[in-house]
Every structure is written in C-alpha cells, then in structure tokens.
Amino acid sequence: MTFRRTWQNKSTHLKITLGAFVLSALSTTSLADPIDKSAIQFIGPLAEDMQLKPYQTDHRDAIIANLLPSLQTSSDSIHLFGNDVDWQAFDKVSALTLGGLQALKFTASTDRFSQGTLTLKGIENAQLFIDGEKQTEKNQAYELALSQGDHQIVIITEQVANWNQVELDFTAKSELDTLQFSAKQQHGLSAKQLFDAPTINFVSMAPNGDYFITSKRHYEDATANQAQYVTELKDAKNNTLYRFESAQPSSITWSPDSKRLVYLLNGELKRLNLKTMQLSVIAKNLSGANGFQFYDSNSLIFSWSKSPEDNGKLTKHYQGLQDRWSYARTTSQVYLLDIATGLSKIVSQGPLSHSLEDFDAKRGSILMSRSAQAMQLSPEPATELVELNLATSALNVLGQFKTFNQAKYTNEGIYVTAGPDFNNGLGRNLPQSMLANNYDGQLYLLSRDGKKATALSKEFNPAIGQLNVLENGDALIKVTEQDTVQLYQYDLSKKRFNKVNAGFDVVEQFSYSKERNPSILLTGTTASTPQQLKQLSLGKSRAKILWDSKPIAYKDTAIASLEEFNFTNKDGVEIKGRVYLPHNVDKSKKYPALVYYYGGTSPVTRGFTGRYPFNLWAEHGYVVYVVQPTGATGFGQEFSAKHVNAWGEYTANDIIDGTKAFLNQYHFVDSKRVGNLGASYGGFMTMLLATKTDMFSASIAHAGISNITSYWGQGWWGYLYSNEASKNSYPWNNPTLYSQHSPVFHADKVTTPLLLLHGDSDTNVPVGESHNMYTALKLLGKDVELIEYKGADHQIFARDKRFDWWDTMLAYFDKNLKEQPQWWQYLYAEK
C-alpha cells in the first residue's frame, strides 16, 4: 500500500529511514511516506567473534566479494561457521550495535530509466552492490542509474554505531526519476541472467551409454568477458567421477570399449583410464590439431591444419576470391596417430585441404571432401567427395558437387546432406520455373562407388542440418522445422522420418550411445523455458531431466508469456509468428511494440535467449512480434526458393502485412509506437522497409546491407551468399536487382528515425554498408544515428559489449516509442 501526503519543500531531496518504502519524485508537491520496515530484510551478526573487520585487513574486497553470493540468494538463512543465521524483517532488530558483519537486502524497481543519489547515514563502513556489481562510493553516497525492471541492492555493513539512527537519503535527479523499494523475492528477467547463466555447451556420451561428459559455461562480474568453464565426467546415474576446472578440454573422444577417454588440453593429447582414473600423455606439440576420434582400439584419426608464415612482403598478391579470407592459405590434412608411441602419419594427399567426413576401419577406408574451387581458383564453389583406401593408398573420386554439406557411411552406401540441386537437381521439389535455395538442406543416399544417388527427403519440409549415423545404419539428424530445431531419425529400412520427441523448441547439443537401442543425451530450450539437459531412449516418448538451469539462474523470475500469431499473406501462404507479452500485461492499457525478423534464408528460432533477447524486451514493457517472412528454410522448398533473386521482394510485404494483422489482433498495442529491427539480412530489411513504409516510429539495423553490389564485392562471403540469394544475377546482367533493391538508392524516401549499429571489424557485412546509409541520410537531413562497436565483427559476443549493445537498442526505442530520452542521453550525452 502506498500513502501520499503534501510535501511543501520544493527540493526533490528525499530522506528515508531504512525500511520498505516507496520513493517518488513525480512532482515536488507529493511524497510517498515510508512504509513498514518489515519489508526490508536484515541479517546479522555474521561471524560475531570476528577480531578485525574486513576494512581493517589487507583483503577487504576479497572477503566481502566471497560473502556476497550467499547473501544474494532467496534462502531464508545462510550457514556460516557451523551456524545458521536467519534473515529477518528489519523492524525486528532492536540492538544498537552488533558484532561481526551485517547485511541489508531489498529490491529497487522502476518502470523507466531512473537516476539519483543514494546516501547512507549512520553506517561508517559498508559496501553496496546492485545486481551483484560493486558500486563506487563518494562521501557515503552512491550514484544510481537503473534501467527499467527490478534491481537487487545488497549493503554489507562493517561498522554501525546505532542501528536506530541508520538512514538512507535518496535524491532523484529529476521529477521523472521514480524508484520503488521493497523486499519482494520475485523479480523480472534481467540481461545478466540471460548472459551469465550457466549453460551446457558440450555433451558427449560413451559408446556403451555408461558414461557421459558435459561442459558448462557461465560468466560473472569478477571475470568480466572471460567465460568460466567446468567439464565433468559422469556415470549413468549422473554422479560426477572427474572434473576439469582450470581449462576446458577439447576433441573429446571415447575408446570403442568405453574404457578410455582421450582429449586435447593445452596442446597435449591425454588419455584417462576410466577404471583407475590414471592420466597419461599420448602426444605433445599438437597446435592446430582437432577432431580426434578412435579409428580403432590402437589409433586415432584427426585433422591437422597449418597456416603459412608471413612472407614479409609489403604487398599481397590475390590469386583468387578466397584470398580475402584471413585463413585462405591455411591447409588441413587428415592424419592417423598411434596411441602407444604417439607417432602420426599423414593419410591425405596433395596440396589441397582435406576435410574428414567419416571412416570405416573394417574396410580400411576414409571418406574425405576437398574444395574443387581451391583446385581451380574458380569463383564457383564445388566440392569433391573422395575415398581413400588405406591398404593401397588409392584415392577414388566419388563425385564433384556444386552443393555439399556432409557425408557419412551407412550400411547401404553413403548418406550425403546437400541442397536440392545436388547431383543435377536430384533433390528438387519445385516448379520448373523456380530456382532452388541450396541452404535448404536435403538428405541423399549415394552408392559406395558414387555412381548412383537417391533423394530421401524431397517430401520432407524441414531443412536438414547435422548428420549422424546410428549403429543400425539409420540416420540421426538435426533439422530446422519451421521456427524450431528438432531431432529426427531416418529409418533406412522403412524409408521414413521419425521425430525424436524431446520436449524442446530448440535442440542444441546432442550425443548418443552406440547400443542397439541407443540412448540420447541432449540440451535445449523452449521459447519460454531456459536450458535443460535431458536423456531419452530412442523410440521411447519420455525424456528424463538430468539438469535444469531454471532453479539455478531463474528462480523467482517472471518470464514473458507467449502466444502464437500466424496470418495468411496475399499469396495465400500462412506466415508463422509469435508474440511475447510482458508478464504483468494489462490489456486495458496501450503498449509500445517491437517487430523483429531476419528475412534471410533461415528462420528466427524459438530459443529462450540469444543475441536478440525477446523475453528481455517484453520485460521492458514492449509487446514483441517475431515474424517468419517468406524465404526461410524449414517450411518446404517452395517457401525457401522465394528467397532467390528476391532481395526483400516478398519479405517486405510479409513484414508490413504481418505487422498490420498483428496490430489489428492486439488492440492493446499502440499503432503509433511500433519499432522494428533486424540484423545482417534483417538489417538490410530494416533499411529497405524504411524506404517503403512509414508505419514504424523507430527502426534499428544491425550490420545491415545498404548496397547489394558493395556487399557482394567486399564482404568476405558476399559473392558466395549471392550464389543463392542472387543466383545467376550479377551487376552487369541484372543491374535493376543490385541497385533498385539496395536501400541507399532510395534513401530520400526514408522518414522513420533510424539507428545503425555495426562492429567496426565486420568482415561479413563490412561497416561501410552502414556508412553508406548514414552518409546519405545525413546529407538528406534525416533522423539517423550510427554506433560502431570497436573491435567487434559481425556479431557482438563480448560480455561488456553485449550489455552495452542491448542497452543501446532499448534506450533508442525508449526515446522514440516511450518519449523517454533519458537513458539514451545517459549513454550518449553530447560532449
């Protein structure tokens, strides 16, 4: 309950006795009185017999930092030096002074970016933390700058003479800065949770299913951009047998009998005996080696790359389009390594790089691929699939293909994944007049000699990605199915696909045993549920949860609600979409909205988090509409083929019409406060939409393409992507496509405020693409901003940059869609 009374003093300086309170500076004539102190949590004394306080030692910061995590949890007590110490309401504290340490904890909430100064009185020595981050103190005062949401404040006190005289002074920077303080446990989703939460980034299961390995990654304030890893070996009952903490092993592989584990760590190849837990070194000096697998019980097969040394010349002579890549002259070959002696021998031949696809130790054959493009210095990509006979060293070329992704042996031949145009269009399921989109992965069966190929997935709409082969010869494949990522088993004997029901919207990592009835270990999320690790037996419907990040990182966290929203476009095609609603949405009010899309050749999948945090945007008060426009894979070949030579032709209409349908359905969204954003091809779409419609009130393009020709010619992979997106079209034979579909050629039509974001080291879509549009719009006197991230490539990965990037996008939309420019001004104050 909030009480208000008239306040005569015109100052916005507010004095609050410590307790649960509401502070408001909405006007200089009203103030919310302090509410009951019982809403503030207090704990103490902590280590009452402490002879010296932390500030009296040489290790104050370390002592306090180590205590903090225990105070941040929602537990009712902490266990300290053998005793339980309970949290209690602050109004129950009657002692004037206490030994040891004490702590106060409460939540600061705001429905907009707010600033002010918090001053501690009556506390002589303390450290204050907001969301786990230590704040800088100046004359017992702390400057607050809080984004919309809930923020945990913890004050660890070391010296208080009289608790009855403790006060907090809060000075709001302006009448618009509003904060509410309480002791509530539930809180809204935060950026730190999404980025820092522990996630499993690697899983591997032993062939017999008795052991498995997981590697978890998390971030924290103390280590900033440096991820923290813990890799664990576990038994079938989920008991930890061995733990790697100091460094993360790679190239983990199991012996065929599941008795030994081999991995690469710090350039050394090591072997762990799972019975004795004895560790031995097999080989050293393996820089550039990766992908180790047991070829048989005595040897390992792997790839070993070598980069050329700098020739010291002042010039660089390009011998082909690939020379724009920093790794163009790096070669990789396939090797065998003898475990007993550590001796390695090369098995692939010639100057070209060879990629290991698969091997069959019983037949003594190795399946590899190599780039025919590199062989011929041709701009047209092509891949040769070759088979090496180890006994005779004979190399058999099985075929040369313009589209190729992966190959694996099976009982009846070789599985191949590639686009619809594989083997002269064998996988096409399209009208003759349409060009296929070869990013739409298909499954094929190739005979052992490469002379006969069969298309297996022409009637299967999901796009096929990662390929694995089970012991019985069936394929286990990860696919993009509409806006989800799923696992399927391809039953080779029955020629059909069977879905593996794991209960995830997005399957991430997976591994499987080599038993007759294989066990599968997999991680994944749903749009509204954070990562879990599950185990299931193939063919059985029930999955067992082995690990769940929700109680670890998202306890007491309110998550946005999700609704499906689809519409039928002008061509009669259903366009999928989904809508995220703020968890406390009040449909009697009007809300701003954000429309997100990619628009390129893949859909925006339903992962819980990612580079574009839809759940976080909803927590900041936006209704978020994610639309899957025409051209994406996962919806069938005809749908994805419309990406070819379109460059926004269908996509723009779907986004515009989808937004109109969304606004018609969601009456509580304010149509005058709708923003839109996308990245890469989605950034191109943002710029293009700005030239076609004024329905959006603010737009953001990250790493967008403004001039198709310059992207094609200068982006590292621009010409390769254009082999599909602009198939058979070039600036000289189709200048209309390259110019009239390029947003910069229509910059004079832009009326919407536009924020351009870009990494200044982007090699995929060079930063000049944003500069083109920025220059044009500035000369035209348009409302445009350009923000570059120093040292960042196409995506923003580093923790500090990611938080800043997320803040920048939200601050820009707050300025333009909520009429709240303060956050943007705080981030980008004019000097």
Predicted regions and their residues:
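Accessory carbohydrate-binding/adhesion or oligomerization-edge regions at the termini
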Residues: A32-S94, V154-A191, D196, P821
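Aromatic-lined ligand-binding clefts that engage carbohydrates, nucleic acids, or primary amines
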Residues: T110, S114-Q127, I153
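Non-catalytic accessory segments flanking enzyme active sites
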Residues: Q193, I200-S204, Y211-K216, S303-W304, ...
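A flexible loop/linker signature enriched in serine peptidases of the S9 family
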Residues: A197, K216-V230, F244-P249, Y263-K270, ...
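Blade-terminus and WD-like Trp-Asp/Gly-His loop motifs, strongest in beta-propeller folds
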Residues: V203-Y211, S251-R260, L264, G291-S299, ...
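Short loop/turn segments that connect beta-strands within beta-propeller blades
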Residues: K234-K237, N273-M277, D338-G342, N389-S393, ...
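Cap/lid segment of the alpha/beta-hydrolase catalytic domain
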Residues: S549-K672, A679, G713-G718
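Active-site-proximal cap/loop segments of hydrolase catalytic domains
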Residues: P629-K831
